Amino acid sequence: LQINSSLFGETGQSSKLAAEFAASLAATTGARLVVRDLAHNPVPHLTAERFTAFATPVAERNLDQQRHVAESDALIEELRAADTVVLGLPMYNFGVPSTLKAYFDHLARAGVTFRYTAEGPVGLLGGKRAYVLATRGGRYAGTATDMQTAFVRQFLGFIGLRDVEFIYAEGLALGPE
């Protein structure tokens, strides 16, 4: 599963890198490549209505809640079906694109992608490898201003993806100085 989160869709730097990486991986392994472009097919941002729908027991959901949950379920099933995840991740104002945050909000579902235990939450989507192609205009990896890496690693681990490799392309907007 290749996930593009650039505002510029497939023409964004992170999307281009992710596409090249995913195509190479698919050619090497013979895997089928599925692409989710969050710019062209954005996931709705989380609302109180959607959040409530996710928490409502199945038998008690009204039609709107069923529709909201079905959208989330489709995203989760797409991820569950993937053996490998390739995420194109541009940095905007030191963080992740809001479209990616919205996507993550639809993936984080108690009892579906994680469960609570006495020892804390346990992710339910394990057994996958994730590659994160992170593009930045400046140089941020390993500094206090790199809030992306910790956030994305934490979220992916939360839902069970613990085998995560970050590949950085930095300094893409630096001038000659």
Where are these regions (language model features)?
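Short, glycine-/small-residue-rich phosphate/pyrophosphate-handling segment
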Residues: Y116-I159
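Hydrophobic/aromatic beta-strand patches that form the interior of the parallel beta-sheet core
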Residues: L1, V34-R36, Y131-L133, E165-I167
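Glycine-rich phosphate/pyrophosphate-binding loop and the adjoining helix
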Residues: A23, G142-E177
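N-terminal beta1-alpha1-beta2 submodule of the flavodoxin-like/Rossmannoid cofactor-binding fold
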Residues: L1-L89, F94-D105, R109
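Cofactor-binding loop segments of dinucleotide-utilizing enzymes, especially the Rossmann-like FAD-
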Residues: S5, T135, A169
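Short histidine/acidic/glycine/proline-rich micro-motifs that form metal-
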Residues: L7-G9, G137-Y140, A173
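Gly/Ser/Thr-rich active-site loops/lids in small-molecule metabolic enzymes
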Residues: L107-T113, F155
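A generic structural signal for alpha->beta connector loops
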Residues: G30-R32, G127, L161-D163
